[in-house]
Amino acid sequence: MKVESVTFLTLLGIGCVLSCCTIPSRPINMKFKNSVETDANANYNIGDTIEYLCLPGYRKQKMGPIYAKCTGTGWTLFNQCIKRRCPSPRDIDNGQLDIGGVDFGSSITYSCNSGYHLIGESKSYCELGSTGSMVWNPEAPICESVKCQSPPSISNGRHNGYEDFYTDGSVVTYSCNSGYSLIGNSGVLCSGGEWSDPPTCQIVKCPHPTISNGYLSSGFKRSYSYNDNVDFKCKYGYKLSGSSSSTCSPGNTWKPELPKCVR
């Protein structure tokens, strides 16, 4: 009686060892070659194998089939799937690219140099193309020079630009009509698609500069217009309070204000 019990247990143990019992797990980058997933109640014996195929975007790591083999300790996987690679991305003119990798699912970020703007998408992804080859999608963008429209017109003045568009870094020069003074920078710069602030043309006439107990030491003129400079000195016995020089400025005023001669 005791021997029969041992024999039964031994046979039962052999039966469990010979069976892996359930279907193996499926790696996320593979699929079963045959429809074993629907046979959830199937039992597999030691030595049985189940084949896998790589999902799109993946390839076999080495030659030969990919399969799991039932062993005494469970399923053992032979071979595996690894990500396919896209071709090396090409550089773009007047721009840079930040490569996050060249494997399936990786991305590239594009940016343009100063003075250029991106035409197209700023990111491309490594994907499986319609022909089965690995491609970057969407295609690489281009970096196009930022352009300014024709520079703005100003009252009582003009500029020397006659183009429809201007590239980044272009400079256009303004001048004023006769009798007007140019206030600001005569040249405007195209930068980032915008012009720097243009000057204005104004009539600037300052009154004759006179100070009590003092006199002009330089800058004698019958009339004074924008940016004319004058210098002052005091008579003997007086000393200068304030700046010794002044400039005719917008608003028909002297700046800094005229000095005084004090005892």
From Swiss-Prot:
Alphabetized UniProt keyword annotations: Disulfide bond, Host cell membrane, Host membrane, Host-virus interaction, Inhibition of host complement factors by virus, Membrane, Repeat, Secreted, Signal, Sushi, Viral immunoevasion, Virion
UniProt membrane topology term: Peripheral membrane protein
Entry GO MF terms: complement binding
Tagged with keyword Transcription: no
Keyword Ubl conjugation carried by entry: no
Gene Ontology terms describing biological process: negative regulation of complement activation; symbiont-mediated suppression of host complement activation
GO cellular component, as recorded: extracellular region; host cell plasma membrane; membrane; virion membrane
Domain of life: Viruses
Subcellular location: Virion membrane; Host cell membrane; Secreted
SMART domains (alphabetical): CCP
Residue ranges of domain Sushi in the record: 20-83, 84-145, 146-203, 204-263
Residues annotated as signal peptide: 1-19
Function: Serves to protect the virus against complement attack by inhibiting both classical and alternative pathways of complement activation. Binds C3b and C4b.
Family classification: Belongs to the receptors of complement activation (RCA) family.
Subunit structure: Heterodimer with A56 protein; disulfide-linked.
Record-given protein name: Complement control protein C3
